[in-house]
């Protein structure tokens, strides 16, 4: 419902480069274009009572059908609805979805969307966490950004994306740049040693140390997978 929000995020992120260089295409559809009546109504009160407003099925259906036409049909197309009911979005899922050729995002608003739209069109629901936002543009763009940055050619170095937090199953290690000393705190000597094996060992130790301290849930999962894989 708020195309300007999406365009602003695209134009001020790596997504702009992806679009400019023809790596990806974005088509932003304004749900208001399919609204009913002089006021272009797109929401109404829920049947059965309750607070909040629900995005109506008819405008959504028309907008989705237009999107399906723009991407070339339903075959092989993922239709994603960011929702607290969905699978938790993760780096693993982002990596998998970065291989997709056609994705349609439905951005919810208000209390939610008519359930009949979910039943008819949505192929995947993803959650970015156990909290509620006022608009679906934010989670949709979060999901999109995490996918697109993994497509070859989007980042200057794909290695940068592959060595961020989580591909190791761990948080990322600390990073340092110039100057060597800031407020009497120096860069660890090992990073200046030029000894590749020692540097890699330090990075691995710091990833493990940071994950164990800051994300015990990830640490537990990491140990479980490590033991399972021998």
Regions found by a protein language model. Name each.
Residues 1-71, 196-218:
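N-terminal nucleotide/polyanion-binding subdomain common to many enzyme families
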Residues 56-109:
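S-adenosyl-L-methionine/SAH cofactor-binding core of RNA-modifying enzymes
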Residues 179-230:
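SAM-dependent methyltransferases
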Residues 138, 150-189:
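Internal, active-site/partner-interface "lid" segment
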Residues 27-29, 80, 103-104, 124-126:
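Hydrophobic/aromatic beta-strand patches that form the interior of the parallel beta-sheet core
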Residues 31-34, 109-113:
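Short glycine-enriched loops at secondary-structure junctions
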Residues 113, 117-164:
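Structured adenosyl-cofactor binding patch, chiefly the S-adenosyl-L-methionine
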Residues 51-54, 88, 110, 114, ...:
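Gly/Ser/Thr-rich beta-alpha loop segments that engage phosphate groups in nucleotides
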């Amino acid at each position: 419902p708020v195309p300007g929000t999406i365009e602003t995020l695209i134009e001020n992120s790596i997504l702009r480069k992806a679009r400019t260089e023809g790596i990806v295409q974005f088509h932003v559809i304004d749900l208001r274009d399919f609204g009913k009546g002089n006021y272009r109504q797109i929401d109404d009160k829920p049947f059965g009572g309750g607070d909040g407003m629900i995005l109506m099925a008819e405008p959504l259906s028309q907008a989705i059908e237009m999107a399906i036409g723009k991407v070339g049909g339903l075959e092989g197309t993922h239709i994603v609805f960011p929702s607290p009911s969905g699978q938790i979005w993760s780096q693993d899922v982002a990596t998998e979805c970065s291989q997709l050729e056609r994705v349609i995002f439905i951005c919810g608003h208000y209390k939610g969307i008519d359930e009949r739209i979910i039943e008819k069109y949505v192929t995947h629901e993803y959650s970015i966490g156990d909290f509620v936002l006022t608009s679906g543009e934010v989670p949709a763009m979060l999901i999109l950004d995490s996918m697109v940055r993994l497509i070859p050619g989007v980042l200057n170095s794909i290695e940068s994306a592959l060595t961020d937090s989580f591909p190791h199953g761990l948080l990322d290690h600390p990073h340092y740049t110039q100057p060597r000393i800031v407020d009497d705190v120096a860069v660890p000597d090992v990073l200046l040693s030029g000894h590749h094996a020692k540097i890699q060992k330090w990075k691995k130790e710091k990833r493990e140390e940071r994950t164990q301290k800051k994300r015990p849930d990830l640490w537990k999962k990491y140990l479980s997978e490590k033991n399972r894989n021998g």
